């Protein structure tokens, strides 16, 4: 899938997107949840994911990289989406919760619910992204490794013990 227009531009949240058919020229090219996007112009990644890709799991909690609700996996590494620009994503692959397999969604939903790790739920997509990033590289992490993987996520409701329990359960 290419996001863009062949004959005109559409403006979305401060950046331009062109739909190119048959491999037209674009400035940046990257994948979001295994769909190819070609983008001309620049802007922040977070509004692109929410407004263009309709990835609503990517939350805008602070817009300055402090809270972690906007975490996505970029080439398998957890990254906050509110900081990087589209140009920084050129040639990369971005994964949001919407791009998880059905089995992964079921696993994380079960683990976080069973551990009682969810209250308001606002932080959970970012926590789950960081969990997947950790477990993809280390399927049997220690408690310290879990804490390190979740260190850039803020939860104002449950604290972190139940969230860490959920990660252990998912492993």
Regions found by a protein language model. Give the residues of each.
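Signature of N-terminal electron-transfer/Fe-S-associated modules in redox systems
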Residues: 18-171
